[in-house]
Regions:
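Short hydrophobic/aromatic patches on the structural cores and recognition surfaces of FHA
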Residues: 1, 16, 77
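Protein kinase catalytic-loop region centered on the HRD/HxD motif
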Residues: 2-13
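Catalytic-loop of the protein kinase fold
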Residues: 13-21, 25
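Short coil/turn segments at alpha/beta junctions that flank glycine-rich nucleotide-binding fingerprints
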Residues: 10-12, 27, 112
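Short, flexible, glycine/charge-rich loop motifs used to bind or transfer phosphoryl groups or to couple energy/partner
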Residues: 22, 65-67, 136
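C-terminal lobe helix-coil module of Hanks-type protein kinase domains
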Residues: 5, 24, 34, 73-175
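Activation segment of protein kinases
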Residues: 28-30, 34, 39-79, 114
Length: 175
């Protein structure tokens, strides 16, 4: 997933709806990132430019709404996505990747509840329990720290890119 995000970000595309339902693992272990209906594309002449083009909704579901409203799945939304900030960038996808990692490590989303308003407030202000301290699970500290870094409320405190997330994981498990 990190590699797919890294490629998308490198060509100026932000997914904006990273969640387990949009991740498919094929029969040979290949990982596919699905449902690009909320993706935002930056013009190719300047990937960091504020001038952006919306990709039309291809698969509108309950978690998605019209322009100017919340777009995405609340359990995996970044604080800046919840606040509908105009200058949202690829770091929002890094947050969502962290939420998916958190769920993979703990079996639970970072924030839960039955009231959407409460979940959104938690996304904005609450720090989830650290995965390595979650129940009796043995989660490697480096993976727990990386996940919590991705879930930082401040986008500047998250890993600098999806490639950095992949690099940290590869460095600690392939060497």
């Amino acid at each position: 997933v990190g590699n797919a995000l890294g490629y998308a970000h490198a060509v100026g595309v932000m997914h904006r709806d990273i969640k387990p339902d949009n991740i498919l693992i094929g029969p040979y272990g290949e990982v596919l990132l699905l449902d690009w209906g909320l993706a935002k594309v930056w013009h190719s002449d300047d990937p960091a430019a504020s001038k952006q083009t919306e990709v039309p909704d291809l698969d509108v579901g309950v978690s998605m709404t019209n322009a100017g409203k919340l777009q995405g799945s609340v359990m995996y939304m970044s604080p800046e996505q919840v606040d509908r900030e105009a200058d949202i960038d690829f770091r929002s996808d890094i947050y969502s990747l962290g939420a998916v990692m958190y769920e993979a490590l703990t079996g639970q989303t970072p924030f839960s509840g039955t009231l959407v308003r409460k979940i959104l407030e938690d996304v904005r202000h609450k720090v989830p329990d650290v995965p390595s301290h979650f129940g009796s699970l043995a989660v490697p500290k480096v993976l727990s720290d990386l996940t919590m870094s991705c879930l930082s409320k401040d986008p500047d405190e998250r890993p600098g890119s999806a490639e950095e997330v992949v690099r940290i994981i590869q460095h600690n498990w392939t060497s």
